[in-house]
């Protein structure tokens, strides 16, 4: 029975991984844009971004899934518009929910890294005659390198968050596990297999991300040894 269950549940791995990659790509670029806006000296823009961050970091991801998937269908004008073509697609809604949620947390990470940039680097850019936008274009990539260890954890959280996609009919790892449980009622074995798959994938991803961190943050070790 174990092998039969495993052969069914592993069918959801490609969907879970694809959801993770697509969501992270959207979230990363959105977070970069929002970090840029937060670093500008405009209180209205900063207030709007902070409202978005509060909404998506202050509410459960599961609630966001249901609001994005079921919410638009409450408005006839959305149903009659071209938007309904994508908003009625469960896969798109799952990717959107994950992306918006991850972008909020990633923005906090990136903006924190920007604020942690030594004052001397800001002053150096100012001494070169660079304006605020030009300075941010130079310093944000540096800040992203410093934020990588924390962002690695966000990548893992997004992958594990894909398990919620099964609640809106997506056949990912948990989707196949839930379907299998509906016919076999062997919760311990079925969900144990699903949990094991998540554990193995997150373990591999963690090892790869740690190696990436060592390469990307090598400049810090060089600076320390040089000092």
From Swiss-Prot:
GO cellular component: ATP-binding cassette (ABC) transporter complex; plasma membrane
Keywords linked to the UniProt accession: Amino-acid transport, Cell inner membrane, Cell membrane, Membrane, Transmembrane, Transmembrane helix, Transport
GO BP: amino acid transport
CDD domains: TM_PBP2
Keyword Transmembrane appears in the UniProt entry: yes
GO MF annotation list: transmembrane transporter activity
TM region(s), chain numbering: 17-37, 51-71, 78-98, 155-175, 188-208
Pfam families (alphabetical): BPD_transp_1 (PF00528)
UniProt KW Zinc-finger keyword: no
Topological relation to the membrane, as annotated: Multi-pass membrane protein
PROSITE patterns: ABC_TM1 (PS50928)
All residue ranges annotated as the ABC transmembrane type-1 domain in the record: 13-209
Job description of the protein: Part of the ABC transporter complex ArtPIQM involved in arginine transport. Probably responsible for the translocation of the substrate across the membrane.
Quaternary context: The complex is composed of two ATP-binding proteins (ArtP), two transmembrane proteins (ArtM and ArtQ) and a solute-binding protein (ArtI).
Similarity-based family: Belongs to the binding-protein-dependent transport system permease family. HisMQ subfamily.
Protein name: Arginine ABC transporter permease protein ArtM
GN (gene name): artM
């Amino acid at each position: 029975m174990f092998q039969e269950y495993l052969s069914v549940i592993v069918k959801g791995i490609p969907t879970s991984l694809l959801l993770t990659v697509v969501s992270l790509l959207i979230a990363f670029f959105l977070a970069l844009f929002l970090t840029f806006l937060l670093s500008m000296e405009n209180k209205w823009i900063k207030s709007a971004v902070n409202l978005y961050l509060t909404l998506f970091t202050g509410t459960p991801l599961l609630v966001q899934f249901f609001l994005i998937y079921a919410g638009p269908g409450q408005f006839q004008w959305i149903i009659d518009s071209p938007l309904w073509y994508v908003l009625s697609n469960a896969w798109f809604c799952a990717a959107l929910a994950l992306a918006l949620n991850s972008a909020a947390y990633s923005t906090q990470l990136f903006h924190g890294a920007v604020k942690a940039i030594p004052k001397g680097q800001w002053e150096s850019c100012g001494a070169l005659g660079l304006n605020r936008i030009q300075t941010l274009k130079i310093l944000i990539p540096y800040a992203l390198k410093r934020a990588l260890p924390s962002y690695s954890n966000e990548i893992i959280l997004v992958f594990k968050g894909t398990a919620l996609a099964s609640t809106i009919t997506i056949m990912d790892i948990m989707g196949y596990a839930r379907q299998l449980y509906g016919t076999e009622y062997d919760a311990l074995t079925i969900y144990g297999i699903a949990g094991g798959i998540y554990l193995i994938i997150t373990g591999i991803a963690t090892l790869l991300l740690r190696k990436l961190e060592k390469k990307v943050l090598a400049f810090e070790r060089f600076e320390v040894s040089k000092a």
